[in-house]
Amino acid sequence: MKQLKKLKLDFGDPYIDDMSKRIVFLDIETSLITAKVFRTGNQVINANQLKDSTKILTVAYGSLRDLNNKGVKGVKCLTNRTSKTFKRDPHDDTELLKKLWPILDEADVVVAHNAAFDKGWLLGRYLELGMKLPSHFFVFCTYQNLRPFNMTSKKLDELSQKLIGTKKLSTDFSLWDRCSEGDVDAFKEMEAYNVGDVYDTLYQVWLRTAYYNPVKAIDFANPDSDLIQCKVDGQYLEELIGKYYTNRNTGKKYQLYANPRSGQIYRDRYMITSKSAGCGYVVPRSF
């Protein structure tokens, strides 16, 4: 049984190289919120008991191109620690969000783990601040990409340990508490933790799992190419001579293709008698 290797893109291809500049891997860290309560233990805390609201502490990000070419040095981190209002309010994320805005605005794809969390908080903060939203971008979630697969845990830290043998930096509640107090050293620790989340875990998990769910994959196939391509890696597919997919209901046949690098099977979108068959319109077979 052959091992399925991690995704390897051809950055010598001008189309993939150009596309990779607009694919952003991103992870955010949010602040603690303070609540007024009468006792300890499990309890329901209502909104009117809150003293403040959730803010963004740090955002680590890097383009696919930079992560491939520079490794962990391709990750940049925006932080409240460098804002002009830090001493007065270490939770003030206005300056951070202004710096992040053009990154999101220019992105075609944003990759995150449990991406609804990151996207939701960022867009929510822009709304609260009355700022214009960035241009629409496609969100690729490394958590949702694994929905067809049952695993003991799909937390990013567990996935990185199980699949690629790396581990997130160890942290606990006290780090967030110290950040709330404006502790400069705590913010530096948070920044290092956040940067590690992007390259050592998020990016590596994406490379490791990209081939497993081609239906939901980021599409690297060049629409102007004459080749029949795999959408996952943007490289050629081989025609499986004499092998077809037959629709059980209609009896129509469709040519099959294979990715020799991953073993993935594709079928033509058009039946073999169609004039459009063999023109490059293919769809991956899924589980």
Set out the residue ranges of the language-model regions.
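Short metal-binding segments enriched for Cys and/or His
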Residues: 255-287
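Short cysteine-rich clusters marking metal-coordination/redox-active sites
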Residues: 227-233, 247, 259-262, 274
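Short, intrinsically disordered terminal segments enriched in charged and Pro/Gly residues
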Residues: 2-9, 212-220, 279-287
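Cys/His-rich microdomains that often coordinate metals
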Residues: 234-241, 265-266, 283
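Acidic, Mg2+-coordinating catalytic module of metal-dependent nucleases/exonucleases
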Residues: 112, 158-224
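Conserved RNase H-like, two-metal-ion catalytic cores of nucleic-acid enzymes
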Residues: 2-104
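Conserved DEDDh/DEDDy metal-dependent 3′-5′ exonuclease domain
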Residues: 70-158, 162
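Short linker/helix segments within small regulatory modules
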Residues: 243-257
